[in-house]
Amino acid sequence: MIANFLFFLKIIRVFKKYNILILIEKNIRYKFLFKIFTYLLAPATFNKSPKDMPDGIRISSALNELGPSFIKLGQLISTRPDIIGNEIAEDMAMLRDNLPPFSRNEAIKIIEEQFDKDIDSLFQNFGEPIAAASIAQVHFAEIKDGQKIIPVAVKILRPNIIETIEDEMYRLDWLTNFLENFSEFERLQLNSVIKKTREIIRFELDLRYEAAAASELKENTKDDQSFYVPDIHWEYVTKKVLTIERINGIPADKIDQLIEN
């Protein structure tokens, strides 16, 4: 119970920091009691985000700070303008899943534990992280196929991320069950949102699902010359490690570059 309260307290204080409590206050019946309650838990001296920051951006910033489960929750909520409104949904649609990377040495430790082999017997030129998100991060490396050297990207789950997610989801279940006792929160269907978030994250915590989906997509599009799916190197895939062919390209959100090319 104490751990759940501390979890709730953390959420309140982060929401206060980004002025999100004001948005909640607008939509509840007992505004004065809510204001007193949140003031006691999160004093006015807490830092706040700029008041002219769009609501969706403030919500996204808070979710990023709260952790991986909240980031995934925000990405799901952003697809429901019927619940949060079009303007907030549009602002949250670009919610970035970016976090500081964990060290190369930690990544090597995870790989060696997964394959029970030394890193040098698996990969050549295993580099520093080039992209990091809430669930996993990516390193460039090379593998050897006979005399051929193949550039690859290696995706690795964050250390302890499975335990972290399970703990966060347990506490989110507790919180949503508590909030749905209040009529103001019933229409948000929080329990169904949390259930869907849990399903999405479950697949992301086992990289073999992603590898299988990529392999199936490659098979289904093999006759389409305008579409290319990188190869999955299955001998270098485990629950926590995914190895995929490295290719050059333009990110889908770089519209100007795509038009130029």
Predicted segment positions?
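Glycine-rich ATP phosphate-binding loop
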Residues: F140, I150-L157
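Conserved ATP-binding/catalytic core of the eukaryotic-like protein kinase fold
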Residues: I150, N160-I165
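ATP-dependent phospho-/nucleotidyl transfer catalytic cores
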Residues: N86, M92-P100, E112-E113, E166-D167, ...
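Residue-level signature of catalytic and energy-coupling elements of molecular machines
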Residues: G74, V138, V154, E210, ...
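An acidic- and aromatic-residue-enriched active-site/binding cleft used to recognize and process polar
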Residues: L157-I161, V237
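N-terminal accessory/targeting segments that precede structured cores
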Residues: M1-Q137, I143, E163-I194, R198
